[in-house]
Every structure is written in C-alpha cells, then in structure tokens.
Amino acid sequence: MRSLLLAIPLCLVAASISAADLPKVGDAAPKFEMTGTDGKVYTNKDFLGKKAVIIAWYPRAFTGGCTKECKSFQEAGSELKAYEVAHFTASTDPVEKNKEFAKSLNLDYPILSDPEGKNAKAFGVLKDDGKAANRVTFVIGANGKILAVDDKVKTDTHAQDLAKQLESLGVPHKSAK
C-alpha cells in the first residue's frame, strides 16, 4: 500500500512533465519530415509561408478512437478544405500499416507515418514506452508558429471542431484570397 501511495505522485509528476514538453501556442513548430500514405514525404518547409498545417497525432491505427478521429477528418474534409490549411493525421505506425488503415476507411487525405518516433518526440507527444503517440493535435500557422494545441480531443467530432476554430485562429478562408 505504501509503495502505491508513493507511485501516485510520481505518475502525476510524469504526466505534468510530458504536458510541459508540448510546444505552446506562439512557439515555433518543431521541424518535421514524415512519409504520407500517398507516398509523398511532407516537411514543415513545404508549407512555410504558404498555408497553415493541422497535424492530429493518434496512438494506433485500427483502434476505436483513432478510427473515429480519422473518419471525422474524412467527413469534415470539405469544411477544412475551405481554408488555406493542409490537414493530416499522424501516428508512429509504419507506412504500410497506415496505408492499410487509410484504405480500410477510404480516406482522401494522407496519414503521416513516424515509425521511429523522432517527430512525435519533437512534438512532445511520444508516449513513455516510445512506441506510440499521445492523441494531441497541433494547428501550425503559415508563419511556422503554433496557433493551437488540443490534447482533449473529441474523436467523433474532432475535425469539425477544428474547422470551426480555423477562422478565429487567423487561418484565411480560400474565398478571402
């Protein structure tokens, strides 16, 4: 019992440390380079000065919450595409597994793969076991700065919720160009 009481504060400290590792609104976004399920390699440089980027990290392909979240991005695709924003989901799963996952959901956007976890680590979302990412979403402005960090994702409506926030975050609407 005593060791359990000692373990609880340590877990709370570990949780607060990982939350402290997340980039904050206004910080420069971490540099990233990840392969998408469409075979292309995406980097932060591809979007810098051009458009905002959404990267929605999820733990594992073919699991309940991750499936709901990816479907949300599929269903809200037209709402997101109305803005000057590129949107991706991302995980530490290998590219082939994410390709199978994307195909099973008939997704029309790329899932980014980070099998070594180096990008997830840079974003502060890599779980302690080093094998999966925590569910956290980043909206990165065209200037490369973090506009929003969401670590309380509602998987069923996540992309719709993001689409509603884009204007207030200063992401231009395509018709405004």
PLM region spans:
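Positively charged n-region of N-terminal signal peptides that target proteins for export
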Residues: 1-5
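Bacterial N-terminal signal peptides
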Residues: 7-15
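N-terminal "domain-start" segment that seeds a small globular fold
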Residues: 18-45, 167
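Short loop/turn microsegments at loop-to-beta-strand junctions
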Residues: 29-30, 52, 134-136
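Short, internal strand/loop/helix patches
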Residues: 34, 88, 98-134
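Short active-site neighborhood of thiol/selenol oxidoreductases, capturing the structured segment around
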Residues: 44-67
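Structural microenvironment flanking redox-active thiols in thiol-disulfide oxidoreductases
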Residues: 62, 67-105, 117-119
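Thiol-/selenol-based redox modules, centered on thioredoxin-like
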Residues: 133-177
